[in-house]
Regions:
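Core SAM-dependent methyltransferase catalytic element
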Residues: 183-202
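Conserved beta-strand signature within the Rossmann-like core of class I S-adenosyl-L-methionine
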Residues: 154-163
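A short glycine-rich, Lys/Arg-flanked "PGG" loop and its adjoining helix->strand segment in the class I
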Residues: 142-154
Length: 202
């Protein structure tokens, strides 16, 4: 009986997350890239690049309802060492309720100095991004990735998901390397994962 109740609760929470995500997509389709949250399988792959033992905090941009956030915490990152930047006020309220202790910041991912405020000079271990970059001009995508790379050590990754077949940030347009990380079929829609890094000086 307890197991059935637990299953019903888990299904209800998943359905609630999907409703929140769909509402966010209806309200702000440019800021929300899909009508359903990222799958737990894609979330674990995205979180796999995070190094919880680096001693540095982790930045997640565009966390939505927190599926990837949960995977990052499961990697061993302490809540106080995880910073989330989310544009939707509804998602911000949800994230603060779901993840007490995590630093949830409401603001624009394309203006991180203003959004991070007194944390603008913080150096992060890595960045996990769910921002729907294909909804923005290429020049803005490049500037976004370059800005994030300025906030992590050389060689450390930015993990970015996208629903298009190609990297949303083209190679050869800035001081970064592009790596195709994975294609996750078990996601709606199927998603491509890309990694961006600054080369380590030899």
């Amino acid at each position: 009986m307890a197991r059935q109740q637990g299953l019903r609760k888990a299904l209800a929470e998943k359905f609630d997350d999907e409703l929140k995500f769909f509402k966010g997509w209806i309200d702000k389709p440019k800021a929300v890239g899909s009508i359903v949250p990222t799958s737990s399988i894609a979330a674990r792959r995205m979180a796999s690049v995070v190094n919880p033992d680096s001693g540095l905090p982790v930045l997640e941009v565009g966390p939505g309802t927190g599926v990837v956030t949960r995977a990052i915490l499961a990697r061993g990152v302490k809540p106080e060492n995880l910073y989330l930047v989310e544009y939707s006020e509804d998602f911000v309220r949800h994230l603060r309720a779901q993840f007490p202790g995590v630093n949830v910041i409401h603001g624009n991912a394309f203006d991180l100095d203003a959004t991070l405020g007194d944390k603008r000079g913080m150096v992060f271990d890595s960045v996990v991004s769910g921002v729907p970059l294909l909804n923005f001009p290429v020049s803005q995508r490049i500037a976004y990735i370059e800005d994030l790379l300025n906030r992590i050590p050389p060689g450390r990754p930015i993990m970015q998901l996208t629903y298009g077949p190609l990297s949303p940030v083209p190679a050869g347009r800035g001081d970064y390397k592009v790596e195709h990380f994975d294609f996750v079929l078990r996601n709606i829609p199927p998603t491509q994962l890309w990694v961006y890094r600054r080369p380590v000086a030899s």
